Amino acid sequence: MEHNYEWGLEKNPANYSPVSPLEFISRAAEVYPDKLAVVHGKTKRTWSETYKRCLKFASALKKTGIKKGDTVAVMLPNIPEMVEAHFSIPLCGAVINALNIRLDPDSISFMLQHGEAKIVLVDREFTSVISQAILRMENPPLIINVEDEMYSGPGEKIGKIEYEEFMKKGDDSYLGEMPEDEWSAIALNYTSGTTGNPKGVVYHHRGAYLGALSNILEWDMQKHPHYLWTLPMFHCNGWTFPWVIAARAGLNICLRKIDAKLIFDLIREHGVTHYCGAPIVHNQLINAPEEFKRDIKHKVEAFVAGAAPPAAMIEGMSVLGFNITHVYGLTEVYGPASVCAKQESWESLPIGEQAKLNARQGVRYHLQSGTTVMDPETMKQVPADGETIGEVMFRGNITMKGYLKNPKATKEAFKGGWFHTGDLAVLNPDGYIKIKDRSKDIIISGGENISSIEVEDVLYQHPAVLLAAVVAKPDEKWGEVVAAFIELKNGSTVTVEELVNHCKHHLPKFKVPKAIEFCELPKTSTGKIQKFELRKKVNSTEAIDV
C-alpha cells in the first residue's frame, strides 16, 4: 500500500541521476580547468585538456561503431593514454577491459575472445603479444597503436591507425554519455587464473563511484593530491584511482615501470603525496641505496595491499617517514574494500607493536555494507576471539556485478548473500580481521594447521631476507611440511642452518621449515609472489632435518 512519502514524490531528472565516476572528470575540468591532470616526461596536460581529449576519443569510438555494452580493451602501461581510457571508453557507453601487460598470448587471446573486444589499444612494447593473440581469433579486433615518448625499446606497430590520428575522427562538440542505470557495466577485469581460464569480473558504475569515494575517505585525501602511479592501472582499474584523482582534481604522475631510483626522483621532483603498491614495491624502496632516499622532506602517504604485508615492511617504511595504510581486497571488490583503520591508542606503542597491529586486514570500508569472518558452512560470524578461523566475506555496493558469462561461478561466489573470498582469517576482539591464509595455503602437518603467513612473517624478520614464500611440501610421515623459498637482499648472505635456527627461536618446532631454497621468486606484474609456481617445484627443494 502506498504511503504519504511515496505519493507524488516520484524520481525525476531534477531530483535523481545515476551515479558514475565519469562525473568526477567533468567537474574537475569545470572547476579546476587549469590544474595539471597528468605529467609524463615532457607531456603535461590540464584537466580541461584531458577532458576534451577524452570526449573527442569517445566520439571517435562511437563513430567507429562502438555502442553501449561493447568492450574496448587496452594493453598499456601507466601512461597518460591509460588514464584517458578510463574515461573515454565509458563516456561512449562502452566497457573498458584493462589487460595485464605481463600475460602470455594464449591468456590474452582468451580474454579478448571471451570479452568480445571490438577494439584494442596497444603500446608498442606489447604488440608482439597482441599480434600472436589475435592470430588465434576468428574475428580479430581493430588495433590502435599508442606511442609513448618515454619508450625507446623494441616492438613493431601493428595497428592500422595511431591513437592521436584516431582521436581526430571525433567531434569537438560531443558531450559524452552518462549511464541511464548506475548498475550498467563500466569495466571488465580478469582474475589471474592459476587453474583453468581466468574469470571476467564485471564492475558497475555505482561500485566504481563508491569505491573511489571510499578510497578518498579512508585516506582523508585533500584536494589536488600528487599521485604517483606505482600501481598498475590494469589491476582492478588501478584500485579505482584514475577516478579518485579526478574526483580530487589531483595530478597523475605516470610511471611506466617500477624503478626505485626513479620513484624517489619523482617523489622529490613532483612533491608526490600519495601512491599505492604491493609489499614488494615497498620492499624495493626500503632496500634501495641510501643515496636514492635523500632530501625527501615531506610526508608521503602509501596504501599497501596484495599479499599480507610483513610487519617488518610496515615498520621499515615508517622509519623512512612514509605513512603506510594497510588495505585489503580482491578483484571482485574493486581492489581495496577493507582498511586497517589506525587508532589513537596505538600511537603510544613501540613502532614494532604498531606495525603488527597495522598489518591486519582491518574493518570494512565506509561505503561497503559488510566485511566480516564467517563459517562458510553455517554462514554465521565466528567468535571475535582471535583464534577461530573462518572465511572473509564481503557484501555491499563495492562488490562486482558477477562473473561474465559464468552464472554458476557467480552463484557460488555469492552463496548465502555474501561474497566468499577464499581467504581464511580470524576476528580479533577489537573487530579487526587478521588473515591467516588463503584456504589453499594453509599447511596441514600431522593434523595441525600452519599459517604460511605466520612463518613468512618470522622469515622476514631476518635481516638478510628480501622476500619469503612458504608452501606445503608433501611428506610421507606428516602429510605436509613447511617449505620456504627465499630471495635474499643484494649483498646479503645467510645459510640454511642459520635461517632454520632463526625460525626455531620464534616458532614451535612443527612450524619450522623442513625445506629451504634460495632463488629469485616468481612474481606477477603487480608484485605478488606466484605461489602456484613454487608448488610445482616444491618436490625438488633441498631437504633439511630439523
Can you annotate each of these PLM segments?
Residues 16-17, 22-26, 34-79, 83-87, ...:
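Conserved AMP-binding/adenylate-forming core of the ANL superfamily
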